[in-house]
Each structure stands twice: as structure tokens, then as C-alpha cells.
Amino acid sequence: MHESIKIHIGRCQMFLLVNIIGLFIFLGIGVIFSRNRKNIQWKSIFILVILNLFLAWFFIYFPWGRAGVKGAANGIAWVIESAHEGTGFAFKSFTSNKMMDMAVSALFPILLVVPLFDILMYFNILPKIIGGIGWVLAKVTRQPKFESFFGVEMMFLGNTEALAVSSEQLKRMNEMRVLTIAMMSMSSVSGAIVGAYVQMIPGELVLTAIPLNIINAIIVSCILNPVSIEEQEDVVYSIKDHQTERQPFFSFLGDSVLAAGKLVLIIIAFVISFVALADLIDRLIHLITHLIANGIGVKGSFGLDQILGVFMYPFALLLGLPFNEAWEVAQQMAKKIVTNEFVVMGEISNQVNAMTPHHRAVISTFLVSFANFSTIGMIIGTLKGIVDKKTSDFVSKYVPMMLLSLIHI
């Protein structure tokens, strides 16, 4: 018994050591590909890393932190129950079965959550929350005010929505700061989509992952694209002076519901299309490798997950996972980058509770963001409609760096 305890402690210490080494390697990769290594503000990076580690400890191990996250997750679940009531009123058969389809259980609640967030925006409640958290984050991390505010905006609004809301600010910023914002946008998550996430993986993991990913995004952008600004440039421009006349509430609410409906249809279309395309490519690769294997007298084949998993495997190992779990996570990470988070969440939703705590935390943190190939197109497209051609072309030139930030996130 004592021997087994010693072996378990030894393994934990080894994986913790690998985790620490992995942190330095990830930071090192960022430094190698940095646009301006001399300008990296290591004091801010150190503060951000410590803050991230503290939040991870607080939310996962500290009783008050765990209780807070659990309470918030239960609150979201309570709101989702109202969403299911709305779905059940229109489609009773959809919600009568405990095993609801993914679209019904995860995506239909968006029809409630998006208008709910928009109502909070309409009455200026959400902007005040964003401003307060952003101000604290800017003071603690010593980052420019807008970059900190934008990190919090992403946590509630999502990438394209946060960019659209911040359009006046982006028009006044230099191209290097806009690139920083584009890189940060790779790690965004929309508060309106959180309701969908918590239907597929435990809510406490989702809510823990969101702030960690936002801080990770700031760390990555500070290393890959360090920018120094003068004090007079560190200004957050108000959008109130540029707003059109305020819509009547029910007209605004109607537009919000329509936007939510379009969002649900878009996500369903993306999920169906990406799953189908990924499966087709996987089948073709299996067929080709099977024919090659038969030609050389070997049995077996491999597919898309295995190919992409090989590339992601070293990164998964550096996260302190055992070899077998690292291989599984590597394939899931690769599939999420190529398709989207909903595809992988749907696959692991029935397995996540059986995973080891560290395995569960790693995969949940990676999945809870919009970071994938299609996100790059969305960000570039949104920026083209906001900033001038010179700035959008500058950002487009650094797509490889955005891809690198995607892997770091």
C-alpha cells in the first residue's frame, strides 16, 4: 500500500515537473517567433503567468473558488432550464426525451441567452461590468487599458462582436496594436455560447477555462507582438458619441432574437459541414494508406486524427499528461483546430467525467474558445470592414503568427 502511494506521488511530481518545463518551452517558442524580442515586457508577463496560476489554483483547489464556480455553473443550468421550456412549448417531442439531440440541448438555448446578454447591453449593465473588470486587469497586469478591456469584452461578447463594438477604438489605433487585438481574438469565447458548452462538458470546467484563456491570450500577444505606447495613447474611446439614435426596446429585442436564430443556424450548418468534410477526408486518407499498406504487405491504415495528432502530440506531452492521455488529447486538439469546438465537445461529452482530473482540465481549457482555422477568416473579414486597407493588409500578412498564437492558447 505504501509502495503504491509512493509510486503515485512520484508520478505526480514527474508530471508537475514536465508541466513547469512545458511552460518555459511554450514561452521560449513565443520568444523565438516574437516580432520584437527586445521590447517584451517581462515584468508584465511574469505578473500574468502568476495571475493565471493563482486563478487555476483558486478555481480548482480552493474551497471558496470551487464553490463560486459551482454556483455560477448551477446558475447557468437554471437559465438553460428556461430555454428548454421555450423549446418544449414549440417542439414538445424535442425535449421530452432525456437524451436530447446536441442541437436541441446545446444550441437552442442560444435563442434565450443571446437576447438576455443583449438586454444587459441595452440597459448598460454589461458594459459597466466589462469596464470594471478591464480596469482592474489593466492595473494588475500593467497592460494598455484597451487591450485589457478587449480581453474582458471577448469573454462576454465573442470575437467578431467585440471587434464590432470596438470599431471606433480600432480605427484610431496603429497597425501593430490592431495585430495584437487580432491575435487576442483567437482565444475569444462568447458568453452567449457558454450555455451551449455547459450542456456538453461540466459547467465548472467551462467557467474556469474562460478567464484562464483570456489571460493566456494576453500573454501570447505580449510575447509575439510586444507593443509600447505613450501614456497619451493609452486611451479608451467611448462609443457613445458615435452611436445612432437608440432603438425602441422591443424593436431591439426583435433584432436580437433574429440574430440569435441566425447564429443557431450558422453553428448547425458549420458543425454538419465540418463533421461531414472531416469524415470524408478521414475516409480518403484511410483508403489511401490502406492501399499503400496492402501494396507493401502490411496490415492497417491511419487517418486524419492520427496525422494531426502527431503534430500536436509534443504540445500535449508538455502539458504534463501521461503518454496515452497525451496522444488522445493531441488528436482532440488537432480536430478542434481543423473543425471547431462543438465537434470535439460532442464526441467527449459522454467520456469527460471518466477522465482523470488533469486530463479533464487540459482538454476543457483548450476546447473552451473559438480558436480554429475558420476563426482567422472571421477575424480578418471583420477587420477589413472596420480598419483601413493598409492596416487590414498588415494583419493579414501575420496570419502565420495568429496560427502560432492559436497553438499556444
Give names to the regions the model predicted:
Residues G22-F33, L48-I60, F108-I119, S188-A196, ...:
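Hydrophobic core segments of alpha-helical transmembrane domains in multi-pass membrane transport
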Residues G65, S82, N124-L126, I239-D255, ...:
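Short, membrane-interfacial amphipathic segments enriched in basic
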Residues V140-V198, A330-V399:
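Alpha-helical membrane segments and immediately flanking helix-loop junctions
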